[in-house]
Amino acid sequence: MIGVEPDIAQLVADTLGLKLRLEPTSWENLFRSVDSGQYDIGFSNITVTEERKDKYDFANYRVDTIAFEVRKDSAIQVRQPKDIAGRKVAVGSGTNQEQILLRWDVQNKAAGLPPVQFQYYTNTADYYLALQSGRVDIYVGPNPTAAYHSAVSGDTKIVGQVSGGGEIAAQIAGMTKKGSGLVQPVADALNELIKNGKYAEVLARWNLANEAVPASVVNP
């Protein structure tokens, strides 16, 4: 696995003197597996929300940014809700991105604009195949995924970004089961990495320096 999430997870494990075992999983299974104790912690661009804090503990490590990605030859720009009206938009089911887009869609329909045509797929590869084939106009996902894909593939571009909290700033965090006792050591490790510069090196490697946080806190 490659990306900012496994890189951060590895640094945290190294700082705590733990051996990291990375396991890829679906978005839905991630939460169930943390609930059951199969996974100790989730690092998967998880947005901190008040609802999630009822069941989980969080140690933040990035500002949450959502990206709108289109084909390289597309003239679409996304700056406000009306820019997605009537578009075919691919987004992950049950994600924070979806919740923001659903609110935008309600707002657009109330203004008499055409509804968004939402499309859902099983994995990221399917989303990008749909985008490249023209079955969708826009893919909406985590900024790190979009930034990496657009840079490596050369076939797409980012045409808009918004906070993962919608109208308010949101945080990305490592997620543990509520009361497990792991979240404070994780936050302490992240703060050590922020101090020694290794955290900044990882974000710079993935072109995400603008998503840095000055400190990690528990349940921000």
Regions from the language model: what does each represent?
Residues 1-45, 205:
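Extracytoplasmic small-molecule ligand-binding "clamshell" domains
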Residues 2-14, 46, 67-123, 143-145:
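Bilobed "Venus flytrap"/periplasmic-binding protein-like clamshell domains
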Residues 6-15, 74, 82-83, 87-88, ...:
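Extended ligand-binding regions for polar small-molecule ligands
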Residues 17-19, 36-44, 87-88, 116, ...:
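Alpha-to-beta junction loops
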Residues 21-32, 76, 116-129:
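Short helix-initiation/N-cap motifs at beta->coil->alpha
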Residues 46-53, 100-107, 132-168:
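A ligand-binding cleft/hinge motif common to bilobed small-molecule-binding domains
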Residues 63-70, 151-191, 208-220:
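Periplasmic-binding protein-like
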Residues 96-115, 159, 190-220:
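Ligand-binding clefts/hinges and TM-proximal coupling segments of bilobed small-molecule sensing domains
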